Regions:
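Conserved Radical SAM active-site core
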Residues: 22-155
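The canonical Cys-X-X-Cys-His
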Residues: 13-17, 74
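Non-cysteine beta-strand/loop elements that form the S-adenosyl-L-methionine
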Residues: 154-167
Length: 168
């Protein structure tokens, strides 16, 4: 299966296995174990989004415009852009690259995240376009979305995987 990760989540689980997908927008993330604290990211940021204090180098995501200057100049590859703005057509084109594999294996595409239903209109359009291409569809969801959305999603899905977060 091909997995398309959509950013944005309506829960903040302490044990989240995809914390980079919590915020809905693309963001610059730092892998602290690779950071040498050279300060180049802070020097090159034209918006003052990167700064340091006793805790180390931090990013103010409200100031960051994701220009990539800090990523390009990081000598230790500690910075990366997580998430990309894509159109429905771009996503479906990527998914269709694996069409031969799907036909041989019975696979398809799974939309995951974060919580894919956070981007419900985009998700619905992607599912519809994949179905038009004859691609089997699935979502991995926490199930925490409006009931009305279920009626719109159901006809476009072959599988629904519900990730149960907690039971009492």
């Amino acid at each position: 299966r091909t997995v398309v990760f959509l950013k944005g989540c309506n829960q903040v689980c302490l044990w989240c296995h995809n914390p980079e997908s919590l915020l809905p927008a693309p963001q610059v993330l730092r892998k602290d174990s690779l950071c040498t604290r050279c300060g180049r990211c802070e020097e090159v940021c034209p918006h003052g989004a990167v700064f340091h204090n006793d805790a180390g180098f931090l990013t103010d995501h409200t100031k960051c415009v994701r220009c990539g200057h800090c990523i390009d100049l990081c000598p230790s590859d500690a910075l990366m852009l997580v998430g990309y703005d894509k159109t429905v057509e771009e996503v479906v084109k990527l998914v269709c690259k694996d069409r031969d594999f799907y036909q041989r294996t019975g696979g398809g595409v799974t939309f995951s995240g974060g919580e894919p239903a956070v981007q419900s209109e985009f998700l619905l359009q992607c599912l519809e376009a994949c179905r038009e291409q004859g691609i089997q569809t699935a979502i991995e969801t926490n199930g925490n979305y409006p009931l009305e959305l279920t009626a719109r999603l159901s006809p476009l899905l072959d599988y629904v995987m519900v990730d149960v977060k907690h039971t009492d």
